Swiss-Prot record:
Keyword Zinc-finger: no
Keyword Transmembrane helix: yes
The family this protein is said to belong to: Belongs to the orthopoxvirus OPG074 family.
Location of this chain's protein in the cell: Membrane
UniProt protein name: Protein OPG074
GO terms under cellular component: membrane
Induction (UniProt): Expressed in the early phase of the viral replicative cycle.
Sections of the chain in a coiled coil: none
Protein keywords: Early protein, Membrane, Transmembrane, Transmembrane helix
Upper lineage: Viruses, Varidnaviria, Bamfordvirae, Nucleocytoviricota, Pokkesviricetes
A Pfam family this chain is assigned to: Pox_E2-like
Membrane topology qualifier: Single-pass membrane protein
Transmembrane feature ranges: 574-596
Amino acid sequence: MFMYPEFARKALSKLISKKLNIEKVSSKHQLVLLDYGLHGLLPKSLYLEAINSDILNVRFFPPEIINVTDIVKALQNSCRVDEYLKAVSLYHKNSLMVSGPNVVKLMIEYNLLTHSDLEWLINENVIKATYLLKINAYMINFKIDLTVDEIIDLVKDIPVGATLHLYNILNNLDLNIILRISDEYNIPPVHDILSKLTDEEMCIKLVTKYPMENVINFINQDVRYSPTFIKTIKDFVNAHLPTMYDGLNDYLHSVIVDKDLIEEYKIKSVAMFNLEYKTDVDTLTLDEQIFVEVNISYYDFRYRQFANEFRDYIMLKESRQITMQTGDKIRRFRRPMSLRSTIIKKDTDSLEDILSHIDNARKNSKVSIEDVDRIISSFRLNPCVVRRTMLSNIDIKTKIMVLKIAKDWKSCALTLSAIKGIMVTDTINTVLSKILHHHRNVFKYLTSVDNKEITVCNCSRCVSLFYRELKSIRCDLNTDDGLLARLYDLTRYALHGRINQNLIGQRCWGPLTEMLFNEDKKRKLNNLMVYIKISDMLVYGHSIEKTLIPITESLSFKLSVDTMSVSNDQYAKVVIFFNTIIEYIVATIYYRLAVLNNYVAIRHFVLKVLHTVMEACGVLFSHIKVNDKIEHELEEMVDKGIVPSYLHHLSINVISIILDDINGTR
C-alpha cells in the first residue's frame, strides 16, 4: 500500500512539475495538497482554503495578512508553539494582548509574554493582577498592591509555593495577613515580616505547626534565644524522634553548645547535628538502634564506618539486611509545570539535519536517488515529511529529489520481525497509512455520532448489537466479566466520539502515538502503570461518561515533540482515537494481571478482550487468533515492564478491522 492515496500522489506530482509553486497547480489539486499537509509556506491567495482545511495552517502565511482571530483559534488548538506560530503571534502581540483574558492566558502558557508585557497589562488595567497571578504567580516578579480581600481570594486558588512567592512581591503585606492565612489555610508564614511577631507562645505554635517548613528561620531573634522557647522546641524535637526535623535541629545546634548536645544525644548527635561521636555498635540501647536504622542515610553520609558496622551487627544478630536509603528530604514547594510549551526538542538526527547533509553532498558530488531513499527511509511513517522538506532551507533541486521519493513510499506490510520466537507480521506502518488514506471518513463518522446517547443510539453500528445498554452498571471489577463489561462500555463511548485519554493516569502512551509522534519508546510499562490502582480504571457504569472528552476536544498537538510531524488536526485526532482503543486493551489486560494478580487462562482472556472491543464497535463476525506464547510475553510485561510487541500486533490488527468497517472497505 502506498503511504499516500493516488489522488494525493497525483497532486504532489503536479506540484513537483510546477517547481513547488502551489499557486500554479489547479484548485482541485491545491485542496488535496492542503488536506494532506503537502505544502510549505503558503501564498495569500490560498488563505481561506488553508484555514478551512486546518486552522494551524495560519502559521504558514506572511504575518501581515493574517487575521488575529485566526491566530487565537490556532493557539487554542495547539499545545506547543513552533517557530512559525510563534513568529506570527509575536508579530501581532499587541493586538493579541488586548483580545481578552483568555487570550492573555494562552500567551502566558506559551511563554509569548515578557515580564514587561505583564507589567504593562496590569498598569494599564487591561488585565487584573489577580487574574494573572492565578494563571502563573511566578511570572510576576515586580512589586504590586492588592487588597486584603484580593489576597485571601488568591490564596484559595493558588498552590502553597505560589502563595509564598506572592508574599515576596506584595508592597502592602503585613503580619496580620500572613498569620490569618496560616490560621485559615495552613500556609506557613515563611517571610521576613514574621520577625515582627514577639508573642513567644504564638511563635512556638507556628514552629511546631510547620516543623518541616523552617518557620524557625523567620522567628524574632529575641524569641529565638529565650530559654523557655529553646526548651520547648527541644522537647518537641525529642518527642518526635526518630523522625528528624533538620531545620529545628540546625536551630538547636545554633543555640546549644556542642558539648551539651553530645552529652544528651550521644550517637544521635551525629545525624541530628553533624557532630562527631565515637561508640561501639554493641553498646547501643534499643532506642538508639531504632533511631540509627530509621536515619541510616545520615550515617552513610556523615559516619560511613559506623553505618557499615551497624549493618553488619544487625545482620549478625537479627539476620536482617538494612538497605541503602536515599534519605530524601521533603521538598517544600515546586513550581507548576505548564503542559504547553514553546520548547521543541530536536532529535539528534532530525530530518532537517539529514536534508542539510544530503544538500551539501549534492553540491560536492553526485548523489544517487537510491542513496537518498535509503538515508531518509526511517522517516516514511512521518506523514509530514513533504511539508518539512518544503519548509527547509535546502536547494529546490534537493527538495524535489526528496519529494519524488516520499511520493512513492509504500508501507512495509510484509516485513517480518521475530518476537519471542513468534514470526509476527509488522502491521503498524500499514495501519498508519490506512489512517492517512481514510482519516477524513473516520473523523466525519466520529463527529456525526458524538452527541448521541449510546444506550438509545440507532447508528449503523449500534443497531446490529445484541446488547445496547451499559454493561458495567452493576459489575465486579475483580472479575473477568466486570473488566470486560467496562471495556465494552468504554469502547462504545469511543466509537461515539468520546474517549478517556487519561485512563491510567498517563496520556498517549500507546504504540501509534509513540511511533507517529516520536515519543520515548523506551518507557517501561510498569512505570507508566504506577497509578493504575487509583486511576479511572476504577470507574464503571454511568460514572464512565464523566471521565470522557469529545474526540474533537482532544489536544492532538500536545502529543508531538515536533509539531511539524502532525499532518493535520483531523488526522492526529483519528490516530488518537485508535491509539486510545489500544490503550484500553493493554490497560485492561495489565490490570487483570498486575492488580488482580490473576494469571489464569491468560490467552483465553486476551482473546475475550479483543473480541469485546470488536463487538462494541459493531464488528460481529471477525475472528482473531492468539498464540499461546502471549502468556510468556505478558508475564514479562508485568514483571519487567517490557513492551508487549505481540499484544500490540494483535491490537493493531483489531483496529485495522474496525477502521475498514467504519470506512466501508471491509
